[in-house]
Amino acid sequence: MQWETVIGLEIHAQLATRSKIFSGSATAFGAEPNTQASLIDLGMPGTLPVLNEETVRMAVRFGLAIEAEIGHTNVFARKNYFYPDLPKGYQTSQMDKPIVGKGHLDITLEDGTLKRIGITRAHLEEDAGKSLHEDFHGMTGIDLNRAGTPLLEIVSEPDIRSAKEAVAYVKAIHALVRYLGICDGNMAEGSLRCDCNVSVRPRGQEAFGTRAEIKNVNSFRFIEKAINHEIQRQIELIEDGGKVIQETRLYDPNKDETRSMRGKEEANDYRYFPCPDLLPVVLEDGFVERLRETLPELPNQKRERFQSQYGLSAYDASVLSASREMAEYFEAVFEVCGDAKLAANWVMGELSSLLNKEGLEIERSPVSAEQLGGLIRRIQDNTISGKIAKMVFEALAADEGASADAIIERKGLKQVTDTGAIESMLDEMLAANAAQVEQYRAADEAKRAKMFGFFVGQAMKASKGKANPGQVNELLKKKLEG
């Protein structure tokens, strides 16, 4: 039987505010346990929450960016459940009237095509605390610094059909919230976490299968691995005559498996009711429109512009627009060199490899956009070859010079373009390889094509990579066939 996967994602984006959603406590990551939890966060008697207006602004800007309906009257509700790191016994969230209604987001698939993913809603809520197990020898410690941290929970429609599509969607959300400046997107610190709802059904069947929810997956790689494992688990279970039960599961990256945590709750299990301590939030049209004017050029808009303005492929445009910092870096390189394709190739190639190797974000790149643009200009005017350019790039990364020109001059790397000098070097190289020359001249066309590369390599070696490759090819062919 052929199976179809159905996936819906709930993404929790921690909003980049300095204080919590209902109190003035700080939200800084990494503070000593329980040093950023106020009486309000702890739910002490007599305390009352005060809504942080900046969280409302951030949520509305997100809603506008996904072309969603904005809830002009939205209500906070209490989500009731017991957990050790939830001191109040309830979480303040939104249920019936969220701040952001139906919207959508386009994602780029591996083949470059676009797919539209529906977004059911996005609502504001407070985070819970954190349970600590490692250092307490049979006990659990509770850190309430995170309690009350503002979250925007973004709920997708069940429009996703594979683990790769899920990753593409999460990456698109990740890029969007960073473009908007509402979340730093640091998944390692828990700023962006994902709950994956996964089910399978026979291909062609309309009704959904029973879903399992994988909680709190916090990396793109783990999202893909967790979903793929869960898909396989459910298919094998059904084909062996079993039934998938609705439950919450946890992904263990060390064992690459999901395991059951608890039965999956429904909304009525949480006994939602309007929070009596918070009035409904009423958003006027003018407030929403003023926020619309603050929206930057968004990732999909930038991708489309990169394709139309610079003639880039859909893939290149998607990679370069994935973060605002990379897009700005690329355009700064282009401003210097004027060649979009070369700029794109170097940013996505040598520069990205360097950043990955060093574990750096592009804003901390050791090679500035101006330096890279200057290097590309020296390739364009034939001052250096592409091979030498990589050596110069490495020198720039190692801070061996302020510019490509300075490094080229100091190391004597300027490309040899003098025809006489190249011919002299070729004559010496061919004389040193006389036997191979005779074999080449006696060979048929197919063998000659293979052997020609040997002579080019010897020529470039003899010139220490400085000879102009185009001239080498042209002159070498004349000499070998003359």
From Swiss-Prot:
NCBIfam families: gatB (TIGR00133), PRK05477.1-2 (NF004012), PRK05477.1-4 (NF004014), PRK05477.1-5 (NF004015)
Nucleotide-binding in keyword set: yes
Gene name, Swiss-Prot/TrEMBL: gatB
BP terms from Gene Ontology: glutaminyl-tRNAGln biosynthesis via transamidation; translation
Role according to the record: Allows the formation of correctly charged Asn-tRNA(Asn) or Gln-tRNA(Gln) through the transamidation of misacylated Asp-tRNA(Asn) or Glu-tRNA(Gln) in organisms which lack either or both of asparaginyl-tRNA or glutaminyl-tRNA synthetases. The reaction takes place in the presence of glutamine and ATP through an activated phospho-Asp-tRNA(Asn) or phospho-Glu-tRNA(Gln).
UniProt GO MF annotations: asparaginyl-tRNA synthase (glutamine-hydrolyzing) activity; ATP binding; glutaminyl-tRNA synthase (glutamine-hydrolyzing) activity
Subunit structure: Heterotrimer of A, B and C subunits.
Reactions this protein catalyses: L-glutamyl-tRNA(Gln) + L-glutamine + ATP + H2O = L-glutaminyl-tRNA(Gln) + L-glutamate + ADP + phosphate + H(+); L-aspartyl-tRNA(Asn) + L-glutamine + ATP + H2O = L-asparaginyl-tRNA(Asn) + L-glutamate + ADP + phosphate + 2 H(+)
Domain of life: Bacteria
Keyword ATP-binding listed: yes
PANTHER family for this protein: GLUTAMYL-TRNA GLN AMIDOTRANSFERASE SUBUNIT B MITOCHONDRIAL AND PROKARYOTIC PET112-RELATED, GLUTAMYL-TRNA(GLN) AMIDOTRANSFERASE SUBUNIT B, MITOCHONDRIAL
UniProt-listed Pfam families: GatB_N, GatB_Yqey
This protein's UniProt keywords: ATP-binding, Ligase, Nucleotide-binding, Protein biosynthesis
Full protein name: Aspartyl/glutamyl-tRNA(Asn/Gln) amidotransferase subunit B
Signal peptide boundaries: none
Enzyme class: ligase
Source species: Azotobacter vinelandii (strain DJ / ATCC BAA-1303)
EC number of this enzyme: 6.3.5.-
InterPro entries linked to this entry: Asn/Gln-tRNA_amidoTrfase_suB/E (IPR017959), Asn/Gln-tRNA_Trfase_suB/E_cat (IPR006075), Asn/Gln_amidotransferase (IPR018027), Asn/Gln_tRNA_amidoTrase-B-like (IPR003789), GatB (IPR004413), GatB_C_1 (IPR042114), GatB_Yqey_C_2 (IPR023168), Gln-tRNA_amidoTrfase_suB_CS (IPR017958)
Annotated family: Belongs to the GatB/GatE family. GatB subfamily.
